Amino acid sequence: MLGDKEMIKRCIMIFPEFNNIEVINNIRKKYDPLANHVRPHITLVFPFQSKIKTDELRKHVENALLKTNPFEITLKNITSARNKFGNYLFLNIVEGMDEIKQIHKNLYTDILDVYKPVWLRGKESYHPHMTVGVVENEKDYEFAIKETEKINEIFTNVVERVSIEIIDNNKDSIIEMEIGLKDNKNY
């Protein structure tokens, strides 16, 4: 494990386990530069670099999740989203949105509050989704939008845990720990 004095880049997310995840994986292989680095996910706490000790972070996440029961999520429809960070393809959450927003809010308190990005500090600024593409070239982006808007698959899962990953220098995701909902069981 990394030393306690080192800066560690982490992210906190949900890794849904859909029966039809191959549909998402195929889209991401085409359009998401991070497809080979991290599994399909919903970000709860965006990447941050800190010296927070593993045990300290575990305790914070366990406390943040204390009153959260496992819950169902449903995702469907891929939409385009342009912002200052790029041209994105988002798989939209249609069920489980309130629970995800509450977890996000609970996590960005205490020791993680200082790592909350400025762009997330406004009212209603967090819109949970699953990124399935980031396309720089405008022509390729327009093609990707047309290709993915035809996809009408529905993705459902019961969220039972939250994952904390370490992002290494190659942008690879290394699961540091997983905390179960309600019972805080460690996976």
Segments from the language model and where they lie:
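Histidine-dependent nucleotide/RNA phosphoesterase domain, centered on the 2H-phosphoesterase fold
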Residues: L2-Y187
